[in-house]
Amino acid sequence: MIWAPSGRPLRADGFAWRYHARHESVFERGATLQQIGPFEMRRLKALSNTIFGVAMTLLAYDLPKASVFKDAPTWIDLVRAYAQPLIALMISFIVAGLFWFSHHRRLSVAPEGSRGEVFLNLIFLVSIIILPVTNGLYGAYRLDGVVAVLYGAHLTVIATLNALLWFLALRGRGNRELLTTAIYPVFVFLIGTVVAAIVPPIAQFIWCLAFGAPLAGWMAARR
């Protein structure tokens, strides 16, 4: 004899078996819902690869085209046309590459995350999407204080989001190398942005110091 959840016996006929099977499937679905755990961060890899790839490609979109020259350009013409955009392109491309590497390394270190971490990762990816916009402005008006500060502030936001995500990924685990590698660019970009507000042409040299983040992490690990 089959007993219903209310405690009343059911007839051992077709109706009773259907009732039991239906409620058993409901109970199984409830147990499955309770077993849903943290989000698998590896699912973000394909999305992040696409976003980084498109953003890093669009960095070259604002480079001057051949149509800007009325005649065959001289070396001086080429330098005047391409110097500033290429400087901005190289800084942004290397920065994006470093953060792409850091992003994938972080997903490997912390393969699971909460909804909040997933949402923060999406905000981080949005900041990467916007990089071609600020890069285009900086390439055209590199010596302008307002544009230089805007570009530096954007780099600082990207670095800060990356560092925050590393803090969340490493919570409860002290790893000086990884934390230093993530935090170092934040201070470099912040200092460079302050300098950009005062002496815009010097800021680009300070921002390039962020490329030494892996070295800073390596030195921190050896102490």
Located regions from the model:
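Short hydrophobic transmembrane-like helices used for membrane targeting/insertion
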Residues: 1-2, 26
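Short, low-complexity intrinsically disordered segments enriched in A/P/G/S/L with frequent Arg
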Residues: 7-12
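Multi-pass alpha-helical transmembrane bundle typical of ion/small-solute transporters
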Residues: 19-223
